[in-house]
Every structure is written in C-alpha cells, then in structure tokens.
C-alpha cells in the first residue's frame, strides 16, 4: 500500500472532513485543511491532530466566492509542502426549488461543489512532477437520490 506523507482535506474542520483529517493524522500523515467559517471547529481538530505529533496547517478560504484556486493551492504548498493526497470534501448545499432559486445560490453550488475540486485537482496533478498521488472526491447521496428541494445542488 502506498504511504502518503502530506494531505490536503477541503472542508476539513467539521463533520466528515474532520474525521478524515484525524484519521490521516493517526496514520502519520501531515495534514492541511481548508475551512470556510468554522474557526472553532478548526481549532478543535487542530488540537486533536497536533496531539498525534504530525504537522498541521489550516487555511481559511471561502470557495463560494470567486476564489483563485491557483493562488490558494500555491499558498498551501508553500506552507505545508508538496501534497501527495488531496481529499476534495468541501461542499455546500442550500435549499432551493426550481421556482425558488437564484443565480447567487446556483453560483455558490457551482463554485464550491464543482470548480473547487476541479481546479484543486488540476493544481495537485501539476505539482506531482511524475510522482504518484491520489485524489479522492467526496460526493453526497443526493447524486443518486435526487429531491426537488435542492435543485441547484
């Protein structure tokens, strides 16, 4: 089994992302996380991970806005080092229906759920320089269990 050394987990401050970050740290992998507004949760996972003796870095970035993912990834690389494991976990899911939605909600879903993983993966592959790496994209059960209440999601 390939042993990864440095991971980036988007949406890594809470829920599944925090669990993934903690698990990777228990495996001895240095962890960087991206979070949006969950600073309290970020500090909680930071304490847990740092108690394991691995390197931890957190990067606040709101993917829902027009984010320059190239600059974000370069910042992560500069502080944390080259990443060999990328977990695209960040997600947003706003309630809307086809009749009650907006460009703002639609753009937020596209930016966080599509653009962020796509462009972070692009940057990840470019920095690998012929080394092996792994990208894991976390998706929601709503991909198969569609409802009319999260239309743009």
Model-flagged regions — what are they?
Residues 89-94:
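Conserved NAD(P)H cofactor-binding loop of Rossmann-fold oxidoreductase domains
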Residues 121-122:
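A short, exposed helix-loop element centered on a Lys and neighboring polar residues
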Residues 13-15:
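Conserved glycine-rich cofactor-binding loop
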Residues 134-153:
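Catalytic loop of short-chain dehydrogenase/reductase
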Residues 29-42:
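Conserved glycine-rich Rossmann-like NAD(P)H-binding loop of the short-chain dehydrogenase/reductase
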Residues 97-98, 102-110:
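Substrate-binding pocket helix/loop in short-chain dehydrogenase/reductase
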Residues 39, 59-71, 103:
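The beta1-alpha1 cofactor-binding region of Rossmann-like NAD(H)/NADP(H)-dependent oxidoreductases
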């Amino acid at each position: 089994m390939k042993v990864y050394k440095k991971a980036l987990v988007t949406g890594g401050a809470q829920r599944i992302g925090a669990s993934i970050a903690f698990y990777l740290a228990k495996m001895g992998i240095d962890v960087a996380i991206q979070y949006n507004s969950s600073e309290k949760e970020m500090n909680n996972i930071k304490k847990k991970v740092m108690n394991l003796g691995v390197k931890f870095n957190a990067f606040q970035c709101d993917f829902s806005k027009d984010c320059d993912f190239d600059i974000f990834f370069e910042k992560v690389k500069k502080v944390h080092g080259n990443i060999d494991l990328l977990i695209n976990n960040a997600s947003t899911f706003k309630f809307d229906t086809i009749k009650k939605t907006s460009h703002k909600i639609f753009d937020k879903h596209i930016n966080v759920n599509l653009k962020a993983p796509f462009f972070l993966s692009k940057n990840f592959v470019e920095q690998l320089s012929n080394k092996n790496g792994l990208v894991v994209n976390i998706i929601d059960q709503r991909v198969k269990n569609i409802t009319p209440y999260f239309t743009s999601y």
